[in-house]
């Protein structure tokens, strides 16, 4: 036995320190056992230590540990199925937990493409600096917006390295996103793409806020081999066991929002470009933000307060912008046929009470004196508001409208207006809601929606 990082009689802790630092093969259970051991030894040592010694230890931030250690059994962070099921049953239901509604909405409307087109307009205003153009996607979803934007980025910056961070809590959406990436690595090989389940206040820096979560950080690097999109796709598909373990979620008892069980970071790049990307590939604890562009498309519930949206989402992302960096935020704003349909069923429904002007006002207050370092552009309605539509044929909305079209229009309307399932039970007992849907479709010759956008940019 020798003196080591954890004190005398600590066994094999050199390897453990490396694992903690790299976020590799350290479960939450292991991290908690270490913390418990430290706490118990702190209590024991404080009984024998003098006030002077305690003061010095607190000042230096050191801890002395002693005692025998035993071999640790391999543990896993996975929760029993019964426990997960019980917690899921007790939590509040959230409208965007329903995968069926989400996928139906995504595949029957062109919102994703419209958001990507709006984001692409920001590219001409960027002023990236070496070693890479840095992009943060605050809510990657199924990767549709990101991959559309990457095509536009390649067109404008064909040889510039890309560093892209996508924040996504949903395992299903991460899988869908990975399916879209092989072609992106073929077209733009100088890309480093990072996917994480960290919170908005943590994701830009790829660093958990709490010590406990940081100790259990699940960091995985994947260097893709080969020279074809097929080979890259096969290697990304093989990551599924890692995703299943790293993207487990639990529900907040207060809000019902999903929270990660274990913080995870997945770093992907092409092995044959690792030399070129050496200064771009992130290392644990060494990511400093500095993003050239950040996209926040529909990252919150419409009914949440402006203070919540700013404090939990907007302010952390704005602070992560680099010099001349830009944040594009997009949210639904209503005043469209979809809201008209919802108001036919629920006349007093007002889901979009917080507009872009209110968000900017609260954001200025949240930033305080730092607000003078940013430009806030809400724009006029003609520039800030853009429209997207549900896919329909002209013949489908002229005379007799098919049932599938009615259901698709109804689903898209209640999804955008964020109507919870429990409120739908009484409405779905009759066909009156389908009659209202048909009336709105015929009146407007289709179904369309309004989104509004605003930009916050850091001054140079």
List each language-model region with its residue ranges.
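Conserved beta-strand signature within the Rossmann-like core of class I S-adenosyl-L-methionine
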Residues: 324-332
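Conserved class I S-adenosyl-L-methionine
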Residues: 130-143, 164-165
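Class I S-adenosyl-L-methionine-dependent methyltransferase module
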Residues: 90, 144, 148-289, 412, ...
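A short glycine-rich, Lys/Arg-flanked "PGG" loop and its adjoining helix->strand segment in the class I
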Residues: 286-288, 308-324
